[in-house]
């Protein structure tokens, strides 16, 4: 999965997919009542990027729905996965469940079209704080009470705080999560970070007792760091330059081993060689 980083304006969906992304990451900010409010990152952000592009969250969802609904004039067949980077650090811990419920209702109405031929992309809820695990249970409760528990089949999870892998496993246990797990590791492109924790996550993914289904690394903008991440065995790379990742995947060393995921590739299944 080539994951376009910080796609917060509707116009950027086309831009990143046209550069080769089959997945996008979108920032979601919340108001003081735990309602998802804007797709907005703010300052500071990655080097070389404008930090302040934004939409109202529900409007962004409508644009995203068009981009992922077959037959729509804005449809992109290859856009198959969306990571919502949930900026819950502005909330109190006891608001996490409410944030999950409100997020689910927004998605149900504006993205999934109340279960009636809505957008088809898989969704990852990426949460920065392990203490906010109830966002997951709240999300699930809301979809169930709204009569659409089947949509949970399209939803996966990530804790994005670079926490100890054992602590992450524990948070999932508390949330009742037993699958659909993506594990992120990374740092802003302004700084360097080694691949030690990525390798631990990959080892967990590949062990019979692991909780991780997929591993992605962020934010990778250079060819050599792309090669290093691929050599470590990641499933996804988040980038400001999807074309750079696509170029490296075309190199002979990687062409035989990796391919760009399509809609038929289940993002919740661990890939077995």
UniProtKB/Swiss-Prot annotation:
Q: Which residues are glycosylated?
A: 250
> Where exactly are the transmembrane stretches of this chain?
none
Name the positions where Mg(2+) binds.
25, 27, 85
Name the catalytic site residues. 5, 41 (nucleophile)
A Pfam family per the record = GDPD_2
Sorted keywords for this record are: Cytolysis, Dermonecrotic toxin, Disulfide bond, Glycoprotein, Hemolysis, Lipid degradation, Lipid metabolism, Lyase, Magnesium, Metal-binding, Secreted, Toxin
Q: Name one GO biological process term.
A: killing of cells of another organism
Gene Ontology, cellular component aspect:
extracellular region
Enzyme Commission code: 4.6.1.-
What does the entry comment about cofactor binding? Binds 1 Mg(2+) ion per subunit.
The compartments listed are: Secreted
**In this UniProt entry, which cysteines form S-S bonds?**
45-51, 47-190
Mind telling me which InterPro entries this protein's record contains? PLC-like_Pdiesterase_TIM-brl
Q: So what does this one do?
A: Dermonecrotic toxins cleave the phosphodiester linkage between the phosphate and headgroup of certain phospholipids (sphingolipid and lysolipid substrates), forming an alcohol (often choline) and a cyclic phosphate. This toxin acts on sphingomyelin (SM). It may also act on ceramide phosphoethanolamine (CPE), lysophosphatidylcholine (LPC) and lysophosphatidylethanolamine (LPE), but not on lysophosphatidylserine (LPS), and lysophosphatidylglycerol (LPG). It acts by transphosphatidylation, releasing exclusively cyclic phosphate products as second products.
Name the protein family.
Belongs to the arthropod phospholipase D family. Class II subfamily.
Protein's recorded name:
Dermonecrotic toxin LapSicTox-alphaIB1aiii
